[in-house]
Swiss-Prot record:
One of its GO terms (cellular component) is host cell plasma membrane. Belongs to the RTX prokaryotic toxin (TC 1.C.11) family. NCBIfam families: RTX_toxin. It is a multi-pass membrane protein. A lipid is attached at K564, K690 (N6-myristoyl lysine). The Gly-rich region is probably involved in binding calcium, which is required for target cell-binding or cytolytic activity. It comes from Escherichia coli. This is Hemolysin, plasmid. The hemolysin of E.coli is produced predominantly by strains causing extraintestinal infections, such as those of the urinary tract.
């Protein structure tokens, strides 16, 4: 390699000037004029561009000679510094890697770094695209680079001048339209200079154009260009993205500048063709189209291309909305790319592919939109210039024609560019499917499901504990994914995509079980045929549909053209009308069908119904049903069916015709106010330029049945217990034992024959046991509980409840009021009545009844009609805490509260008609024995004597309970406890050996009183 010294360069500088001048002259008058004008404008702007050569620098090859010669010809000052290169870089550039620096002398180009760049220039040129590798054919490599630097500097300065004028005008300064027009023309000239210095070889660019010559052939002044553009390759074969845009724009620019021999420099400038190089693709995409579009969208000027014009007053009717939409495309592409990172790790790169599509088409869109905007700006600028006679009218007319042609070319090319990018993405998908032998979009759903399992592991792994089983079998539906659907539409693969995919996963002991080939011998889940088989399971199992599962069947898709640019992929479902479930055979299981979609809309408010047929095993099973019909064959064990986990309509359960225990027909009306899961067909529309793709897919809605009433029918076999809905349900029991739960709502529950257990739960319910020994539980709400024939246990729960028992003298009934103001009506038999908390009415009837009262209860009224052995247990009260007083025919018992016993405040018991003795009245309203917690007894006779004694000797109308004792001790409680146990045992078939809540509630308390006594030591007050 030859080494050249600074001295040698100085000695040959004079001859180099002449050589460079000749070379510049041969480049063409247009280029020479442009470059000289650029140099002049740079100097006029008051800035100097300097090529700085340190004294110790030795150039390589002949490139330094070229630098010096061309710099001199271009008017760039060459300076030699006495300092060495290291000192200069430290002082001016800060680092030896920088090419350009700013000093007090001016903008400085560091020769050693530029020389290094020249050695790599050929390689760089090949990368830049278009005809960039031919840059500098007439001026040399050095001239191309230096003139580019110079013209960029001039462009920046010209743009700044426009910015200053615009800012001045916005702030109220006096700026005329002619000043703006002149500044615009100056900027246009600068851009033309840049184009001319780079794109002076038309042959290298014209080969890239599409067959657009026919459009231009008949245009005046441009027929030469049109002829040159005939018979060129199709645009679909040109590279995608910015390379495509750059190639087209470079070719158009070079052709218009150099092919029209009759056009002078001013005409070329007025035409504004060179402004199409705004995207600067042929200088390595040095200025980002995205940044330009964003700045323009924000109303800001830039120093790149003609972006300053966008914000200027001469721009007419330029809408920023187009730029905003482009900016949004890039934002969305970035979000999709960010979203894609997780799924790449899970084996799916479709999201990244979609992001790349939006970035490439967004770049094309940004470029073409920006160019169209600039062309409109140029036309406006030239028109403004024409009004001030800066250019002639013919030039102004030519501008409109040329810019219109270019806009048409770009618009015609846009769709082809978009489709080329889409085809690239489609090729990637096809290649992946060929390699892996699998549907690409199905793989996307697999990745989505893997992420779902990761995100929800804590919930999924705890289901077995929640449902008290050993194993959870969880079926999950991954529903339609809009990004997957969008990619399918973009790549014309709508017929290959899926509405989603369903999965089955297994969990035990908080861990997910991997599906091994030898672990699960048969296909457990077949969503195409609608089969689920758990018969091989050896563990207690939960079958749960975690997300709404689409109806079983096969999807068939067909993509067809529906318009010039419109396509639709239509969906046909070859559905199966039944889910068949084989349950766990020897262990208890839970089957949660509440998320199973059983209604599919097929158009015109018509519905297809999918039934559930469930064959359970011999364990104790639980079944949660959905809104559709079902056949449940429960098998052995104690099996429970639930209707309350989702909206299952208005429920009627009928066992009146059953010939075997556990058989019921369940009718459900899905009225207009009932919301159910419905499968529907929806469409996603995707646009690729002018092309639109509609893809149909299955989804679901939780919605009303459009004002119509649908009736569903369930057939239940060998089901021991039923739980109703949240609505007002009707239950009609069989002649066998029925166990019904009303759940929420105001329910009507009739047990009919058999020993039934009826639960009203929430709501104002009516429960009737019918014949048999029944147990009725009202639950929350104001309930009515009716015990008919047999021995009945009635528990009202919370609320103001009413109890009725209708048995004969042999009947034994338990009536427990619970909280609230209750009314308890006994039968002719022996009844146990406990009003519970609240102010209650207790009417035992004609039998020998037992009443129970605790200190925490409210004011009770006992209206006993008969019986010669009625008893009252004051289970946790001592007689020293009460007093008795006669009021008319009633006997009032007052109890102490807070060590105060207040006569006149009815807080204990009123014994209605205790003293009533009418002629011929066989009724007996007295309670024959009143027990306190210690077993001491007051009888009607002992109470009568005590009251008479107090009235006679103390002139008092009341008597302490302790002064009315007849007899009794702790041992006298045993017979009472035995009687209570017999009634409880008979009522509702309670086994007294078992720990029954109801029985334990009715046991008598043997605890000591909370009060501390002397004899009648509590404070006694009287009140009116």
């Amino acid at each position: 390699m030859t080494t050249i010294t600074t001295a040698q360069i100085k000695s040959t500088l004079q001859s180099a000037k002449q050589s460079a001048a000749n070379k510049l002259h041969s480049a063409g008058q247009s280029t020479k004029d442009a470059l000289k004008k650029a140099a002049e404008q740079t100097r006029n702007a008051g800035n100097r561009l300097i090529l700085l050569i340190p004294k110790d620098y030795k150039g390589q090859g002949s490139s330094l000679n070229d630098l010096v010669r061309t710099a001199d010809e271009l008017g760039i000052e060459v300076q030699y510094d006495e300092k060495n290169g290291t000192a200069i870089t430290k002082q001016v550039f800060g680092t030896a890697e920088k090419l350009i620096g700013l000093t007090e002398r001016g903008v400085t180009i560091f020769a050693p770094q530029l020389d290094k760049l020249l050695q790599k220039y050929q390689k760089a040129g090949n990368i830049l695209g278009g005809g960039a590798e031919n840059i500098g054919d007439n001026l040399g490599k050095a001239g191309g680079i230096l003139s580019t630097f110079q013209n960029f500097l001039g462009t920046a300065l010209s743009s700044m001048k426009i910015d200053e004028l615009i800012k001045k005008q916005k702030s109220g300064g006096n700026v005329s339209s002619s000043e703006l027009a002149k500044a615009s023309i100056e900027l246009i000239n600068q851009l033309v200079d840049t184009v001319a210095s780079l794109n002076n070889n038309v042959n290298s660019f014209s080969q890239q154009l599409n067959t657009l010559g026919s459009v231009l052939s008949n245009t005046k002044h441009l027929n030469g260009v049109g002829n040159k553009l005939q018979n060129l390759p199709n645009l679909d074969n040109i590279g995608a993205g910015l390379d495509t845009v750059s190639g087209i724009l470079s070719a158009i620019s070079a052709s218009f500048i150099l092919s029209n021999a009759d056009a002078d420099t001013r005409t070329k400038a007025a035409a504004g063709v060179e402004l199409t190089t705004k995207v600067l693709g042929n200088v390595g995409k040095g200025i980002s189209q995205y940044i330009i579009a964003q700045r323009a969208a924000q109303g800001l000027s830039t120093s790149a291309a003609a972006a300053g014009l966008i914000a200027s007053a001469v721009t007419l009717a330029i809408s920023p909305l187009s730029f905003l939409s482009i900016a949004d495309k890039f934002k969305r592409a970035n979000k999709i790319e960010e979203y894609s990172q997780r799924f790449k790790k899970l084996g799916y790169d479709g999201d990244s592919l979609l992001a790349a599509f939006h970035k490439e088409t967004g770049a094309i869109d940004a470029s073409l939109t920006t160019i169209s905007t600039v062309l409109a700006s140029v036309s406006s600028g030239i028109s403004a210039a024409a009004t001030t006679s800066l250019v002639g009218a013919p030039v102004s007319a030519l501008v409109g024609a040329v810019t219109g042609i270019i806009s048409g070319i770009l618009e015609a090319s846009k769709q082809a560019m978009f489709e080329h990018v889409a085809s690239k993405m489609a090729d990637v998908i096809a290649e992946w499917e060929k390699k892996h032998g699998k549907n690409y979009f199905e793989n996307g759903y697999d990745a989505r499901h893997a992420a779902f399992l990761e995100d929800n592991f804590k919930i999924l792994s705890q289901y077995n504990k929640e449902y008290s089983v050993e194993r959870s079998v969880l079926i999950t539906q991954q529903h339609w994914d809009t990004l997957i659907g969008e990619l399918a539409g973009v790549t014309r693969n709508g017929d290959k995509t899926l509405s989603g995919k369903s999965y089955i996963d297994y969990y035990e002991e908080g861990k997910r079980l991997e599906k091994k080939x030898d672990e699960f011998q048969k296909q457990v889940f077949d969503p195409l045929k609608g089969n689920i088989d758990l018969s091989d399971s050896k563990s207690s199992t939960l079958l749960k549909f975690v997300t709404p599962l689409l109806t079983p069947g096969e999807e068939i898709r067909e993509r067809r053209q529906s318009g010039k640019y419109e396509y639709i992929t239509e969906l046909l479902v070859k559905g199966v009308d039944k889910w068949t479930v084989k349950g766990v055979q020897d262990k208890g299981a839970v089957y949660d069908y509440s998320n199973l979609i059983q209604h599919a809309s097929v158009g015109n408010n018509q519905y297809r119904e999918i039934r559930i047929e469930s064959h359970l095993g011999d364990g104790d099973d639980k079944v949660f049903l959905s809104a559709g019909s079902a056949n449940i064959y429960a098998g052995k064990g104690h099996d429970v069916v639930y209707y309350d986990k989702t909206d299952t309509g208005y429920l009627t359960i009928d066992g009146t015709k059953a010939t075997e225990a556990g058989n019921y027909t369940v009718t459900r009306v899905l009225g207009g106010d009932v919301k159910v899961l419905q499968e529907v067909v929806k469409e996603q529309e995707v646009s690729v330029g002018k092309r639109t793709e509609k893809t149909q897919y299955r989804s679901y809605e939780f919605t009303h049945i459009n004002g119509k009433n649908l009736t569903e029918t369930d057939n239940l076999y060998s089901v021991e217990e039923l739980i109703g809905t949240t609505r007002a349900d009707k239950f009609f029991g069989s002649k066998f034992t029925d166990i019904f739960h009303g759940a929420d709502g105001d329910d009507l529950i009739e047990g009919n024959d058999g020993n039934d257990r009826l639960y009203g739960d929430k709501g104002n319910d009516t429960l009737s046991g019918g014949n048999g020994d029944d147990q009725l539980y009202g639950g929350d709400g104001n309930d009515k509980l009716i015990g008919v024939a047999g021995n009945n246990y009635l528990n009202g729960g919370d609320g103001d409840d009413e109890f009725q028992v209708q048995g004969n003298s042999l009947a034994k009934n338990v009536l427990f009021g619970g909280k609230g103001n209750d009314k308890l009506y006994g039968s002719e038999g022996a009844d146990l009545l406990d009003g519970g908390e609240g102010d209650d009415l207790l009417k035992g009837g004609y039998g020998n009844d037992i009443y129970r009262y605790l200190s925490g209860y409210g004011h009770h009224i006992i209206d006993d009609d008969g019986g010669k052995e009625d008893k009252l247990s004051l289970a946790d009260i001592d007689f020293r805490d009460v007093a008795f007083k006669r009021e008319g025919n009633d006997l009032i018992m007052y109890k102490g509260e807070g060590n105060v016993l207040s006569i006149g405040h009815k807080n204990g018991i009123t014994f209605r008609n205790w003293f009533e003795k009418e002629s011929g009245d066989i009724s007996n309203h007295e309670i024959e024995q009143i027990f306190d917690k210690s077993g001491r007894i007051i009888t009607p006779d002992s109470l009568k004597k005590a009251l008479e004694y107090q009235q006679r000797n103390n002139k008092a109308s009341y008597v302490y309970g302790n002064d009315a004792l007849a007899y009794g001790s702790q041992g006298d409680l045993n017979p009472l406890i035995n009687e209570i146990s017999k009634i409880i045992s008979a009522a509702g078939s309670f086994d007294v050996k078992e720990e029954r809540t109801a029985a334990s509630l009715l046991q008598l308390s043997g605890n000591a009183s909370d009060f501390s006594y002397g004899r009648n030591s509590i404070t006694l007050t009287t009140s009116a």
